[in-house]
């Protein structure tokens, strides 16, 4: 097959297509391994061609983070603040699970995009309209997002979270242990982790509800 001319590929490129490719590449290899050259290769173009559409790698990452924020549902206006924030947090966890590289970057950008700013404004509005003071809004937002991002980061880095993979991992760890060693770990693994239906991800909503209940009591 005759290669397409570089000019044709360049005409097909756009900022949106560059960001599409960047998101797909980061989902595949992670953001640490992400480079402009690898992105150019994935888009079948040359690195310098990308700079016709984005000024820098930082600008690409800014756009990627903004896209993740766009995937997160904002707190529904028709709900009270507590169920609205619960809905938003579950949506955030789902978006971060789709993009495991994103959690450490979500609050790192010095040039946040419109989706990022709009999301933060919507969350602050939800908490304030729910009757929380400015001080309690600050406490609530910091606590909630520390939990959401922390859980997402932990979940993304676990070697297994459920099913046969978790059973195989747990067995490989506990089987070589000397008899009688680590009794609490052994009990927890045998009677909880290795039970049918165990899913580490199910812990997310339990912890989230504890946080929201506590905030409601203090609001």
Regions found by a protein language model. Name each.
Residues 1-29, 33-38, 42-45, 54-62:
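Basic, helix-initiating cap at the start of DNA-binding domains
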Residues 53-54, 140:
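Residues in the recognition helix of alpha-helical DNA-binding motifs
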Residues 165-219:
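A structured, mid-to-C-terminal "fold-capping" secondary-structure block
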Residues 119-143, 147, 151-174, 197, ...:
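Hydrophobic alpha-helical bundle segments that form small-molecule/ligand-binding pockets
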Residues 73-118, 134-137:
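Hydrophobic alpha-helical connector segments
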Residues 16-24, 59-75, 84-91, 118, ...:
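Alpha-helical structural segments
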Residues 1-13, 73, 183-192:
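N-terminal intrinsically disordered/low-complexity leader segments
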């Amino acid at each position: 097959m005759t290669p397409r001319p570089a000019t044709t590929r360049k005409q097909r490129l756009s900022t949106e297509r560059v960001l599409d490719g960047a998101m797909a590449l980061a989902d595949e290899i992670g953001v640490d391994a992400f480079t402009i050259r690898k992105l150019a290769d994935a888009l079948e173009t040359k690195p310098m061609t990308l700079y016709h559409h984005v000024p820098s790698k930082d600008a690409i990452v800014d756009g990627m983070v903004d896209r993740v924020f766009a995937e997160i549902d904002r707190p529904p206006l028709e709900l009270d603040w507590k169920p609205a924030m619960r809905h938003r947090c579950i949506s955030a966890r789902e978006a971060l699970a789709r993009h495991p590289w994103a959690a450490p970057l979500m609050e790192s950008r010095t040039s946040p995009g419109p989706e990022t700013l709009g999301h933060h404004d919507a969350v602050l509005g939800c908490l304030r309209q729910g009757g929380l003071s400015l001080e309690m809004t600050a406490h609530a937002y910091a606590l909630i997002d520390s939990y959401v991002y922390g859980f997402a980061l932990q979940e993304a880095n676990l070697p297994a979270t459920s099913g046969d993979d978790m059973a195989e991992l747990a067995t490989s760890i506990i089987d070589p242990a000397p008899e009688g060693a680590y009794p609490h770990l052994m009990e927890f693994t045998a009677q909880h982790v290795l039970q049918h239906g165990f899913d580490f991800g199910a812990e997310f909503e339990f912890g989230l509800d504890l946080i929201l209940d506590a905030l409601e009591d203090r609001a």
